[in-house]
Each structure stands twice: as structure tokens, then as C-alpha cells.
């Protein structure tokens, strides 16, 4: 929602592979991701949570990278080392950049924080998210950070939303006063709605809501958010 792999996750993996003498293209990796996506979804549906600790994160992501490389035809003997180096690369702060609409949003929300608005991060991320945000110079814009790698719960689990509500001085009985913005329909929209928080779906890629019957506030850019909040147009 706020940051992205720079220049892109396929480009980073292709670069790491090239450093090991393996030629894979970003386009091939995107196609490979579509192939392994059903298995990733199955594992999530079965309750697997991959950011709850650094060891589980490494195990999950190296499995993902190995699967992507396998789909691209990389030899089994070469894959483990490349998958490990991919994990190292994505843990490097230099691999991440804030979206162009992040800074303007945070500046706009700072004005509202001065009037009493609580602004927090609720993220499925490893425990190094806060140092990353400090490195990017944006951590000071938030009143609280609720990170799956620190609380050992992941969206859409209700418990992590309870942690975020508590950080804002709220609970389930006052959850309707909160707004949660995210770019994952299952983790963010469904998860927030499940505990009574008003969801806003950030659909940068204009994918369209998968649940056509659900009335959900949708934005294409974070720049649209402050006006919606000010107008009270976001409903639980």
C-alpha cells in the first residue's frame, strides 16, 4: 500500500539470477507467479502465516523463489543458492521505495493528526518494517505500527485488527470509527469488515472488486483518501 519493490519484484529476482549466471526475464517470472499462485492461496487458506517470525518468513519466501525459478526452467541444483540470494535481496532496504502517492498522503494526514486523527500502520510484514520506514524517513508520520512479524498474527486474522484498534484506543464496540486502507481484497477489505472497521480498497491496477455484491469504497490512488475521510464517505 505504501511501499513497493524497486524497480519491481520480477526485476530484482532476474538481477539476482543473472548474478549467478542464470538468465530469466521479468516477463517469465510474472507468468511463473500466475502458475504458483493457486498453491500459495491454498497454503494461506490452510492457515499458513509466513511473516509471524523471521525463520518462517525465510522458509516461505525461499520456497516461493524456488518455485518461480522452477517454472522458468532453472535447474534444481542451481535454485537453492539463487532463492537464498533473492531472500537476502528483498531484505535489503535498498530494494524498497515508497509509492509516489505516499508522501503527499502522509503530509495531508499530518494536518489531520494535529486535529486528533490517529494514523497507524497495520501490515503483514516481517519485524524489520519499522527500521525500513525509519530508513525511508516516513516512520514519524505514524502514531503506531502493528506488524505481523511482531504480534505473530496476520491479516485477515481478526486478532491483528484487534491489536491495531487497541493501539488507537478503540475496540470492537468502536471499530466503526476506524478506517483501514489496503490493496488486498482478502487481507484488507474482508479482514477489516470482519471486525467492523470501514474498509477502503486501494485498487491501483483497476482490477475491480472480486465480490461484486459487496459495497466497498474504492480508490485508485492514495491521493483520494483524505477527501473521503473528511467528507465521511467511508462506512463500515
Annotate each language-model stretch with its function.
Residues 1-100, 104, 115:
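N-terminal helical cap/lid subdomain that shapes the substrate entry/recognition surface
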Residues 27, 74-79, 103, 107-108, ...:
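Asp-based, Mg2+/Mn2+-dependent phosphohydrolase catalytic module
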Amino acid at each position: 500500500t505504501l511501499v513497493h519493490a524497486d524497480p519491481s519484484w520480477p526485476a530484482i529476482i532476474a538481477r539476482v539470477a543473472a548474478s549467478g549466471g542464470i538468465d530469466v526475464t521479468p516477463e517469465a517470472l510474472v507468468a511463473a507467479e500466475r502458475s504458483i499462485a493457486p498453491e500459495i492461496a491454498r497454503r494461506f487458506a490452510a492457515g499458513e502465516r509466513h511473516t509471524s517470525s523471521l525463520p518462517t518468513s525465510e522458509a516461505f519466501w525461499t520456497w516461493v523463489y524456488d518455485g518461480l525459478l522452477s517454472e522458468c526452467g532453472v535447474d534444481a541444483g542451481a535454485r537453492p543458492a539463487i532463492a537464498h540470494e533473492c531472500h537476502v535481496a528483498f531484505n535489503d532496504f535498498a530494494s524498497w521505495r515508497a509509492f509516489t502517492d505516499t508522501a503527499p498522503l502522509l503530509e495531508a494526514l499530518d494536518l489531520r493528526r494535529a486535529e486528533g486523527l490517529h494514523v497507524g500502520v497495520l501490515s503483514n510484514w516481517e519485524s524489520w518494517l519499522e527500521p525500513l520506514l525509519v530508513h525511508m524517513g516516513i516512520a514519524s508520520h505514524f502514531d503506531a505500527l502493528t506488524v505481523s512479524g511482531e504480534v505473530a498474527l496476520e491479516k485477515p486474522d481478526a486478532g491483528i485488527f484487534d491489536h491495531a484498534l487497541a493501539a488507537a484506543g478503540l475496540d470492537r464496540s468502536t471499530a466503526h470509527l476506524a478506517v483501514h486502507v489496503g490493496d488486498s481484497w482478502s487481507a484488507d477489505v474482508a479482514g477489516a469488515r470482519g471486525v467492523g472497521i470501514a474498509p477502503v480498497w486501494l485498487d491501483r491496477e483497476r482490477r475491480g472488486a472480486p465480490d461484486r455484491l459487496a459495497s466497498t469504497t474504492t480508490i485508485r490512488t492514495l491521493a483520494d483518501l483524505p477527501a473521503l475521510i473528511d467528507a465521511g464517505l467511508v462506512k463500515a
